[in-house]
Design a protein with these regions (language model features):
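Glycine-centered hinge/linker elements that transmit conformational signals in sensory
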Residues: 93-96, 136-166
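Hydrophobic residues within well-ordered alpha-helices
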Residues: 1, 90, 97, 175-180
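A structural signal for short loop-to-beta-strand junctions that line the ligand-binding cleft
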Residues: 3-6, 10-15, 41-75, 105, ...
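Extracytoplasmic "Venus flytrap"/periplasmic binding protein-like
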Residues: 1-45, 74-85, 176, 183-184, ...
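Short, solvent-exposed loop/beta-turn-alpha elements that line the ligand-binding surface or hinge
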Residues: 32-46, 106-112, 128-149, 197-208, ...
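Hinge/lid segment of periplasmic solute-binding proteins
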Residues: 17-66, 82, 91, 117-120, ...
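C-terminal lobe and pocket-closing loops
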Residues: 190-205, 216-308
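Extracytoplasmic/periplasmic solute-binding protein
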Residues: 53, 58-62, 67, 91-139, ...
Length: 327
């Protein structure tokens, strides 16, 4: 996206962005503030859809996402296990499932080395109450007790997962679930539609239930981040082009008919959206006070470093302190 938007005129007039991907676009001054266009043509857009950064509207969000728990109701019931609300309970439940002989690797999350693994660290660190950078600076602030506790929990969960967990992204763990190998899973809310459709084993589909994200370490906010998807407008395009693009996309991002027709395809931020069963994870995350993924200029670099540096700790080749020091 960056090269396409850097061209003058840019190759696209709009770019779909999220919490993390908007930061490089802003850092390089590639997208334009939308305040005037919102005032003029944003009648159907709700205030909650406006992504405001440094006092300027830089994006219009249309859907929300988060990672939360999925569980097999039948497996938990058979073993008398309550629905886990904390990661400590997820570990205990997974150990009980393994001990019963029902499943050898009862837990799954997207631990693929790189972006996915780093996202799991981000979620767990936030759940422990961590702050990624020292106040008012770009200096990392993860090599501490909260960082170590985060890594130790990720390690415990990885030991209850398929041994190939470092290659497993969201699609791979979805396949594990649909194959009946997993009873507890942390996965994106946006993936719930394909897990609850009519295409897989009907018994697994029927037993697949959704709940909110887990907390960790005695914390009271979820070990999860809230995400938004929305549209931004390219700076390197004529004003008339930006205006026409905004009008078209603002119509789409406030279209009540679309929201009604596609109510179970996403958690829409559009007025008139009625949440269905597939939205429960995001709705619960919001109720529990989940924090948004940090929109900080330096967060991209940290995310990239985390995805590679904590692999050796999970493989038992490095201490938690050394892994965090390497970030």
């Amino acid at each position: 996206a960056v090269p396409a938007l850097t061209a003058n005129p840019s190759e696209f007039s709009a770019r779909i962005a999220a919490n993390s991907s908007i930061v490089p676009l802003m850092n390089q001054d590639l997208i334009r503030p939308l305040d005037d266009l919102v005032k003029k043509y944003g009648k159907g857009i709700q205030d909650s859809q406006l992504i405001t950064i440094d006092g300027k509207v830089m994006a219009v969000a249309f859907m929300a996402n988060t990672q939360h728990l999925y569980y097999r109701e039948d497996v938990l019931k058979d073993l008398g296990i309550a629905i886990p609300k904390t990661y400590e309970e997820v570990v205990a439940a997974s150990e009980k499932i393994r001990a019963s002989g029902k499943m050898q690797y009862p837990y799954a999350a997207a631990y693929k080395a790189g972006w996915n693994l780093a996202e799991e660290f981000v979620n767990m660190f936030i759940g422990h109450g961590g702050e990624f950078f020292k106040s008012g600076s770009a200096q990392p602030n993860i090599n501490n007790a909260k960082g170590v506790a985060t890594l130790n929990m990720l390690k415990k969960l990885s030991e209850l997962s398929n041994p190939d967990y470092l290659t497993h992204d969201s699609e791979a763990i979805k396949v594990e679930w649909e194959s009946g190998n997993v009873a507890l899973m942390t996965l994106w809310a946006s993936r719930s539609g394909t897990l609850l459709d009519d295409e897989g084993d009907p018994n697994i589909t029927k037993a697949t239930k959704l709940t909110g994200p887990a907390t960790v370490g005695g914390g009271n906010i979820p070990a999860a981040t809230l995400w938004w998807d929305g549209f931004t407008l390219a700076k390197n395009r004529p004003d008339a082009d930006a205006e026409a693009t905004f009008r078209a996309l603002a119509h789409a991002a406030s279209n009540k008919k679309m929201v009604a027709d596609a109510a179970d395809q996403a958690v829409w931020l559009v007025e008139g959206f009625v949440p269905g069963p597939k939205s429960i994870g995001v709705i619960e995350a919001v109720k529990m006070g989940a924090k948004p993924y940090p929109m900080l200029p330096q967060m991209g670099l940290m995310h990239g470093a985390l995805g590679s540096e904590i692999v050796e700790f999970l493989q038992g080749k490095e201490s938690a302190e050394q892994a965090l020091k390497d970030v």
